[in-house]
Amino acid sequence: MPIRVPDELPAVNFLREENVFVMTTSRASGQEIRPLKVLILNLMPKKIETENQFLRLLSNSPLQVDIQLLRIDSRESRNTPAEHLNNFYCNFEDIQEQNFDGLIVTGAPLGLVEFNDVAYWPQIKQVLEWSKDHVTSTLFVCWAVQAALNILYGIPKQTRTDKLSGVYEHHILHPHALLTRGFDDSFLAPHSRYADFPAALIRDYTDLEILAETEEGDAYLFASKDKRIAFVTGHPEYDAQTLAQEYFRDVEAGLDPEVPYNYFPHNDPQNTPRASWRSHGNLLFTNWLNYYVYQITPYDLRHMNPTLD
């Protein structure tokens, strides 16, 4: 799916170098079709890097996807130029009267922070409440899953003693589920989190359908039966080097991190890691766009009436 972004967004040239189909706004205006409107709430510190990762996964289908980037933290960023944020991001007040086909809420490095201590926790709750009436389907990633489970279902924050970092095997529980259509029975995906997601806890607190689990019984992929919300507890959007960058950052900070599991060849950080989850990540986002967004969203977004027909 060609993603539709502003002509000057840095991701345009970055993704074109990878032969990813990126359609600038000026070119898209000549096509008489309605693009899917997808809002990305980017909570990661390195916003440009995160943009590249998610836009890459949203680019593999014949329809246009019109991307809008959202920020809710007004504090000065230490990792992203203010000019970039001012040029390419909107504030919630700018879009709160609009409707969107899809919303993606990214992860955030807040696994050890209590929810009420998160600087923008009230804004997170505001966006999630707003999305019930203004978004067809929302996809939560990693920390955003934990936040959404607390806000929407009252599930207390579950924190691991040690950080889960590495590339783990998962297995699908419902081979004919739309979100896992085309998945291998077992597949790999990266994790980088302190949050804990026991499958039994999800089943006890919610009516969400768990579609894939880790070998240890953690929920990886789950969704509501009406397709309005979906959750992925890992980071299928990560580049091959992202876990390495996080590991060496923590080493330099003197944190003595564990070597990411099943990631570096021969478990040696001096070896170059390879992405073993790329096909899974692409298929997951393609399925979400197709079955959870495109097939149930109304043609006229002025009238939000998602349907499963």
UniProtKB/Swiss-Prot annotation:
Known pathway = Amino-acid biosynthesis; L-methionine biosynthesis via de novo pathway; O-succinyl-L-homoserine from L-homoserine: step 1/1
**Residues of the signal sequence?**
none
A GO MF label: homoserine O-acetyltransferase activity
Kindly list the residues the record flags as site (Important for substrate specificity).
Answer: S192
Task: Supply the name of the protein.
Answer: Homoserine O-succinyltransferase
The UniProt record gives the binding positions of substrate as: K163, S192, R249
Quaternary structure (record): Homodimer.
Please describe what this protein does: Transfers a succinyl group from succinyl-CoA to L-homoserine, forming succinyl-L-homoserine.
Q: Which gene encodes it?
A: metAS
Which NCBIfam families has this protein been placed in?
A: metA (TIGR01001)
Instruction: Return the annotated site residues (Important for acyl-CoA specificity).
Output: G111
Cite the SUPFAM superfamilies for this sequence: Class I glutamine amidotransferase-like
User: Which keywords fit this entry according to its UniProt record?
Assistant: Acyltransferase, Amino-acid biosynthesis, Cytoplasm, Methionine biosynthesis, Transferase
Has the keyword Transport been applied to this entry?
A: no
Pfam families cross-referenced by the UniProt entry: HTS
An example GO biological process term is:
L-methionine biosynthetic process from homoserine via O-succinyl-L-homoserine and cystathionine
